[in-house]
Amino acid sequence: MQRMIRALLTILMGTALAVITVPALPAQAGIWHEYPTTLNTTCSETRVHNGTAYQVCLEFNGNRTQVRAVAFINPGAYTNFQVNLRLWFGGDGPDISDSCPTMTTNASRACYTAFTDLRRPYVVTEAKFGIAGTWQLPVRALDMRLSAKQQERGNWCGPGAVQTTLATIGISAPPQSELADKLQTGETLFGATMPGRIPAVINSYIPASDWQYKWEEIAVSNGQTYEAGINRIVTSLSRGRPVMVLVIPGKLPWWNSSTPTLRHYVTITGYGGVVHADGSVHPTTFKVADPADASEHSIDVDKLLLDNANLAWNGIDSAVIVRT
């Protein structure tokens, strides 16, 4: 009997060791799906290769507490495609990779990650598509854990945008009345908030060791300085720091009235664009929060800066931004 027990124990121990030494299974690749119904997204531009359109988006849940990455592709004809998809967070947040294998079809398809908690300071997704055997430049979208605030008075867009900026960074946002006093909004002609007063007010609520805000004029009539200004906006967003911009509200696509004499602040919190071979990002769209009603909108970069912001400050050729 003892011999049988020893033999049984030997078998069981061998089985346990065998279980321990079995190699881990590789991560499962994603699968292509039909297009999902999306509600709130921040997306890269739609690019086209050989008649096949593609883009990547950050999709947020209804209360903007969770996010996932979605890669969309729309073939113009039967073709093969695949995608490598990545979702990551600034700071020490998680870094999630997924991929959908080669598929041949003429139907629209989407590859996406699972929803995960949205974290500060920012979230990024990037997708690299292989289409008809050729890898494309990666497309990217970045956004933040937005905490949009609605201005409490008709001329408090400045305090509302500053409050949105601080809350989105993760700082307990002070009352708009306090911000309006510090910005001297009520002491200015027409009750306006002057851009030069904004950086010091924002910086008074953040540590001196953190990125400090400043304001500047971008000379948009010069291609080189215009691109440099866009790069500085991208740099600030890539730090998880929103950017405020002065605009003529009636020229915004979501406004329904002409306001040639009014000025207004909106807050840029994200972008969508393409990643070039040298690693630089060229955005084609911005995601903005409008304090008029605490709404979010996507807008073409040139539409915002060239067709709108450049007319808001001195009437010609320069846009005013507040950024880190």
What are these regions (language model features)?
Residues T225-A289:
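Active-site-adjacent substructure of cysteine-protease-like catalytic cores
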Residues L142-E227, N310-T324:
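Cysteine-nucleophile protease catalytic domains, especially the papain-like/related folds used
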Residues D98-R140:
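Short, solvent-exposed, Trp/other aromatic-anchored flexible loops in extracytoplasmic proteins
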Residues M1-C57:
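N-terminal prepro-regions of secreted/extracellular proteins
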Residues N40-T41, Q55, D98, R109, ...:
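Extracellular secreted precursors and ectodomains with disulfide-bonded cysteine-rich loops/domains
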Residues E34-L87:
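Short, surface-exposed binding/anchoring microloops in extracellular/periplasmic proteins
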Residues P260, Y271-T324:
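Noncatalytic regulatory segments and standalone regulatory/sensor domains
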